[in-house]
């Protein structure tokens, strides 16, 4: 700690005694280094991290290293490079202050030629300063969730440290700065490349240099001579006007997962002075072109002219203490590819490592890339430092083909002037090649959430509602929706003390199954698990049954969106795809890479060619989220009772074609669907009545109606007499319809639970189905009238639960198979 160093100058002296210091992990954080040294109990386990003395780490720390310059450094200039610190650092070499890095995207490239000694030891000392609090958004740019969120704990030290690579490099007099390769596609048969880079003369003398780029595959070579004054920098540009070889015929395009191969190119840049290489760099890129629209107020993404139906997931921290490094990113991203995802949202931009983007490039995973602003209506302490880091991020990452969207703010718009600055930065330093979406859940998006488990039918109905978003609700493009996800038993016991296994107690809350993750609603998760699979008698049974719920819920989320593909659904990303901390919420694979039921549910639903069942309408559809048409496919349905015997009355087979980017209905399973009207003649009450009685809406007649006074917040409810299964309502609106209204249920007519809401009511008959719920009272609650009179209903019919045919057991199974014209299996699915 800085406080423990009485003489900072001594730290910078050779031979300084560091025997009492802690070995630092670089890249890494201060707290992670202390944990690795065994000076703190395992923070993954129990409530250990909550018992750490925060004051011990919430302060500035010194890093120190001694090094020798490599003997093979035979060029004139030696550079000391920093790729990232959190949050701020003062860099000293051999007692000389080289500079200060401010913000975790701020790169440091220090010319230390005249500071280092090449024939002895050098002392590097770095004073790392903790982020300012509160982090959101005052402390930004930083890892905002380091102060704790509803899925990860407060990390002592707020993940301060040297968080990215530190290395020496050796060059000649002339160096290259931030090469930038842009690609455009007049057609998919022809690509046009443009290249820009800065060339810097680091010496005081005028120099003549030659810059060459070589693109592979294809061995495309381009070159230009440049003359530079002493200590000058110049921008070079290469494009088809003077370098026709940058027009590439039949290019190998970069495609997202499911739409084609994620082909990559590399360009090796060299700058030579006097025919000697002064510096070389290699840049990996992909030939692709993104485009976008917001037709019908819904955000759509296209790549290479093809619409992409987005199936993806959010990432929070890659690991809550920044211990995910190198090849581990490849594992994480590959698991997303194996789930058939095509996008990851880098939530709040808290994944900063180059290896993440490289893995997404390789695996064909697009990135929705946030900046570091949460919905709090405040600005960072230093908006100019923030803006500098925005530019740094764009320059560092713009060559990655995986980046599809830049996003300004999580669940709001950046406060002025940041939104305008971000937009201009993207136009200037990314050429407008990627879209800037200022708000993560509005302006063409359908809100955030919900984040808890529901009956599968919920996701197919007109009520997969999100918070905020655009008034025209629907499926649309949803950047966050999720559920609690209990891990498998073998993972659970790795982080939970034995005495807290069962029954559940407060220790579970430390791992986010309780009030600490209220949005995950552990109570509803429990209720669905018990109702669907029976009450568990211990932790092993609970974990086992939870996997069935995890499969069922996560599969239904994606299938609900696929069921409305392009009408109006265009994309869905669950909250979240991976786990940064051992928890029981919002994950597909867990912290230990064990695959939960959520993984298998998502993997099934997101396969490129997928057969699925709508549990509300009983329609069977095939979703084709590829760039390829399929013909002569066969869909097959079989239904089995609990005894394993097939019920032949429901067997169906049909042949059909599946065009690219469609969801085609191929058949309907003939389950009984006529629901009983259970409200006829039942007592009915209203907030007001004009020229009619509330009972006129439940008398079964088509020529009598209830009407309210002229006001918005009016209601009508029916008393069914006792609790019974309710599965929907059928409204017949007169010309004075409800434009926005809710359907609510209650056991006591005092506390009401919402089961449906719409902002798009219309005159006429509207049948609304929702997951069955036991209730005595059912209410229509008006929010906004569609006409200048009050609300008026010819009929308010309450519908009972789904009927079950006599030949079917209460629990029965549906098996779906999709084969090609030669009988090869393409997709298989199941339900119970």
Language-model segment annotations:
Residues 32-69, 73-82, 86-93, 99-102, ...:
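Active-site-adjacent substrate/metal-binding segments within catalytic domains
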Residues 197-202, 506-680, 800-832:
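Carbohydrate-binding surfaces of carbohydrate-active enzymes
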Residues 1-81, 140-164, 171-172, 295, ...:
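Extended carbohydrate-recognition surfaces in non-catalytic/accessory domains of CAZymes
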Residues 2-3, 32-33, 37, 53, ...:
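Accessory beta-strand-rich segments of carbohydrate-active enzymes
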Residues 343-517, 545, 549, 553, ...:
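Substrate-binding/catalytic cleft of secreted carbohydrate-active enzymes
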Residues 117-121, 196-294:
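Extended acidic/polar, glycine-enriched regions
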